[in-house]
Amino acid sequence: MGEYARSLAIATGAAARWPNSSIRFMLSREAPYAARAPFPATLLASSPTHHSAAVIELIEEWRPDVVIFDNAGRTAQLRAARRCGAAVVYISARRRQRRKAFRLRWLGLIDEHWIAYPEFIAGSLSVFERFKLRIRRRPRVRYLDVILAGDRDSKPDLILDRVGLAAQGYVLIVPGGGTGHPGGEATVAHFCAAARDLAAAGFDGVFVGPIQPEADPHRRLRAFGTVPQSELAQLMRGARLVIANGGSTLLQAIACGKPCIAVPIAGDQRERILRCVNAGVAMGAAPDAASILRAATTLLADRGSLDALAGRASDLGLTDGIEVALRAIDGLIAANCG
């Protein structure tokens, strides 16, 4: 999940939990989502990481209780937040940012370090990381596991009625954007072809992605450019099988207890997929239409394997990262007020 989508999910949860709270984003005005951000936003010429003066000025003027740096941030920005009395949260989504958060000078600036994946994906704290935490006695480290918008107990009936499908009767195909990764667009096209071929083979499907499959003469395939995260979660819960990239979409499907086929659209996803395959919660497929189709038809023909994948996914017990974040924020605000 991208930094903005993750932060937006947390902010939306915070606004629902604390209706009187004030929430503000700092975004690049060049980002495609900047113009439609649902919260007040300060727009900068590029990533806020590169505009420390503007970030520091806003922190000093606004004086927030909590500042969240999602996979970005400069030392001067963190220091400004601490100087103004704010609790500082840093979210790391990659190894480089995780190493950055464990630098000794940053350990003294961060109150909470949230790792943006489950422990079995991101890895347990190393001996050296634990040693540093013992020395500095901070920050608190948490794994967000998975960001899954919407009520976990909600039923998918509404959106399924809209698309004319029955629960457990369709395959959900979600390639992700792919546009930010070399070769990503080509892989998304392979997802499209596989979705079309599955429909031709007699399987109902829902495709959610930026490239739309060719018209399905059998009308078994429903295609959407985008859907809200809450509706995507409902589609996952109602699916018989989910075919996804190796990013956050895969983890969301696993958290829903669904059998998954994972296809990498970026280099860093291969290791993530391998960890899921080794944990028995996903099946991998090469990023080409024939391999995706073969994996899907093989799995769909084997009810025992489908059920086994779903069972292991449910047993993994991934926690709701939004709830983890909100509990942490509540504790930080209580500590600051105390």
Q: Which residues does each predicted region cover?
A:
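A nucleotide-sugar donor-handling region in carbohydrate enzymes
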Residues: 109-177, 210
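Catalytic binding pocket for nucleotide-activated donors in carbohydrate/polymer assembly enzymes
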Residues: 250-294
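Active-site and donor-binding regions of nucleotide-sugar-utilizing enzymes
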Residues: 1-17, 24-133
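C-terminal alpha-helical cap of glycosyltransferases
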Residues: 318-338
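Short acidic-hydrophobic, aromatic-tinged amphipathic segments that line or gate anion-handling sites
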Residues: 42-50, 222-227, 282-288
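Donor-nucleotide binding loops and adjacent catalytic segments primarily
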Residues: 161-238
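Conserved donor-nucleotide binding/catalytic region of nucleotide-linked donor-dependent transferases
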Residues: 283, 289-290, 295-314, 335-336
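Acidic donor-binding loop of glycosyltransferase active sites
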Residues: 237-247
